[in-house]
């Protein structure tokens, strides 16, 4: 079945659509805070440079390449766990601040 359409011109439709919607203030805050991006970049640089530095430093001091590779892998995991821990702590701080704000509103 065909649907019935009104005999409205495109100019009338445009006038109705702009007249019905009040102007809204746009939110220009970034979706992700700057300190989060900087923290991610810092840990990314550390994730690349620390294992490589550890590998070449241990190789330069005469360690075998096997032990150098193992130490580089361990350092990569340490940095990964540090990043997870820092993100977890930051999330807890946000939750505590939100809970305090809700408790203040409830009073």
Swiss-Prot record:
Q: State where composition is biased (Basic and acidic residues).
A: 1-10
What keywords are assigned to this protein? Cytoplasmic vesicle, Endoplasmic reticulum, Membrane, Transmembrane, Transmembrane helix
Q: Which InterPro entries match?
A: Vma21 (IPR019013)
- Specify where the region named Disordered lies, as residue ranges: 1-29
Motif Prevents secretion from ER mapped to chain:
104-107
* Cellular location(s): Endoplasmic reticulum membrane; Endoplasmic reticulum-Golgi intermediate compartment membrane; Cytoplasmic vesicle, COPII-coated vesicle membrane
Source domain of life is Eukaryota
Lumenal topology: which positions?
57-66
Task: State where it is primarily located.
Answer: endoplasmic reticulum
Disulfide linkage: none
Q: How does it sit in the membrane?
A: Multi-pass membrane protein
Query: Record's Pfam families?
Result: VMA21
The Gene Ontology biological process annotation of the record reads:
vacuolar proton-transporting V-type ATPase complex assembly
Topological domains annotated Cytoplasmic = 1-35, 88-107
Which residue windows are transmembrane per the record?
36-56, 67-87
Question: Cellular component GO terms, alphabetically?
Answer: endoplasmic reticulum membrane; endoplasmic reticulum-Golgi intermediate compartment membrane; ER to Golgi transport vesicle membrane
Described function = Required for the assembly of the V0 complex of the vacuolar ATPase (V-ATPase) in the endoplasmic reticulum.
Q: Can you tell me which family this protein belongs to? A: Belongs to the VMA21 family.
Q: What is this protein called?
A: Vacuolar ATPase assembly integral membrane protein vma21
